[in-house]
Design a protein with these regions (language model features):
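DNA replication initiation on ssDNA origins
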Residues: 1-81
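Short glycine/proline-enriched loop/turn "hinge" motifs that connect secondary-structure elements
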Residues: 73-78, 112-118
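Hydrophobic, Leu/Ile/Phe/Ala-enriched alpha-helical segments that form helix-helix packing faces
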Residues: 43, 47-51, 103-107, 152-160
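Short, conserved phosphate-binding/catalytic loop or strand-edge motifs used
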Residues: 115-130
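Short amphipathic alpha-helix segments
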Residues: 92-108
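DNA replication initiation modules
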Residues: 3-11, 66, 72-93, 128-174
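Structural recognition of the beta-strand scaffold that forms the well-ordered cores
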Residues: 83-86, 113-114, 122
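Short beta-strand
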Residues: 111-117, 166-171
């Protein structure tokens, strides 16, 4: 399964679809690992108002679907069933690591990693229809994704003992 990896470079949107193995490698020790560490250090010293200046230099991972550029905008290429949950507002990076380990130990978790700030955890959970397939049409994918997101929140929140930050379950977010 692939996800979309994108960033703005010199004002131009650059999008790539990548396999999950590539993304896991990128998160562990890819070329952006140094940039992530640098931004984390700066975030610890910066005021909240400036954090967007720092984080805009890094790529964005859209776990829910793959996309392609279409003229002036982007278009859904394929829905992949990945739901992204976020546990935000943790006290420290060590607490975030502990929550990440708990989430990674659950059998439903595909991927769990500490967020850019070092005080959040991102959890990727795969979902499929009862027959093992995924919705093909965009509207069906949106409805399925919203239901899968709610199910994932109801499952993970009591398991982790942490509050899942409720987000709008966009296909572009995960």
């Amino acid at each position: 399964m692939q996800i979309t990896y994108y960033r703005h470079k010199k004002g131009v949107l650059r999008m790539h679809s990548r396999d999950m193995e590539y993304i896991v490698g990128l998160l562990k020790n890819g070329k952006d690992a140094e940039a992530i560490l640098s931004v984390r250090r700066k975030l610890n010293m910066a005021f909240l108002a400036r954090t967007t200046d720092l984080s805009g230099k890094l790529p964005v991972l859209a776990f829910g679907s793959t996309f392609k550029k279409n003229g002036d905008g982007i278009q859904l290429r394929r829905y992949n069933g990945y739901v992204l949950l976020e546990v935000n507002g943790l006290e420290s990076q060590s607490e975030a690591e502990a929550v990440r380990r708990e989430a990674a130990a659950l059998p439903q978790t595909l991927l769990a990693f500490v967020g850019l700030s070092g005080r959040s955890v991102k959890i990727v959970v795969p979902f499929v229809l009862p027959d093992g397939s995924l919705p093909k049409k965009e509207e069906q994918a949106r409805m399925f994704h919203a239901a899968a997101y709610q199910l994932a929140v109801r499952h993970y929140q009591p398991q982790l003992g942490s509050i899942i930050s409720l987000k709008e379950p966009f296909l572009s977010r995960g």
